[in-house]
């Protein structure tokens, strides 16, 4: 499969590629040894998002972070498939099988939390434990016919995508990132994060056309593995509501909050986040 990847990217000694049964070649980084721990990135991100986790948790686990199809560095790796959360669920399950990893400790953030949640539902034999950090997606509340993102959030994301489509990439990214974190988050973010988001800006319009599925009491009841839910103390209300509700719906779920942090809590407070994950998995 033809993938255009900069030579400097291939120089990363931790970078490898897994060829899946579907034909997709999925890039990933791996570090450490021991029980396998797989990290699933969210919107505008890729395997680089998890650098603070691999740097620490690889002392205890075989840490593996893939970039899902359509994301950097191999934006053409999944070109034959539509961008969709279900395709990402399927390919992540294939990825775990291809590397003969399962069952794994699965960690997902934001949109990646939704993907990880649905891998645990649809492929329970592949997941030993599940950690969801600010999981993205709407909540299906009892008595409500159809769950969806709040209208204000949807309108803002649509405006952000329109800016990107018009070539005002950084303005669109700033609007989106601030909306899922807190005002000023984009300007305060590191140049490394901004570079990663710009590299993945083309995925945001695709994401808007593919709404995440709702969490419901019924779907949460399908989660059979040990589960940890993490939110940031300053994360937007929709993420904190997801963590609050899922911690009640998923049997025997544990819950932790990263003090002083917003949506990117794993990067803002990596020592605390890593401790929560390690203590949960090792218990």
Model-predicted segments: where are they?
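Conserved alpha/beta-hydrolase catalytic His-Asp/Glu region
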Residues: 165-205
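Gly/Ala-rich beta-loop-alpha elbow adjacent to hydrolase catalytic centers
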Residues: 108, 112, 116
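Conserved loop-alpha-helix segment in the C-terminal half of the alpha/beta-hydrolase fold
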Residues: 217-264
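Flexible "cap/lid" loop of the alpha/beta hydrolase fold
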Residues: 117-122, 126-164
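Short beta-strand immediately N-terminal to the catalytic nucleophile in serine-hydrolase-like folds
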Residues: 106-108, 133
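Catalytic active-site module of serine/aspartate enzymes centered on a nucleophile-bearing elbow/loop
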Residues: 251-283
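Conserved acidic catalytic loop of the alpha/beta-hydrolase fold
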Residues: 86-104
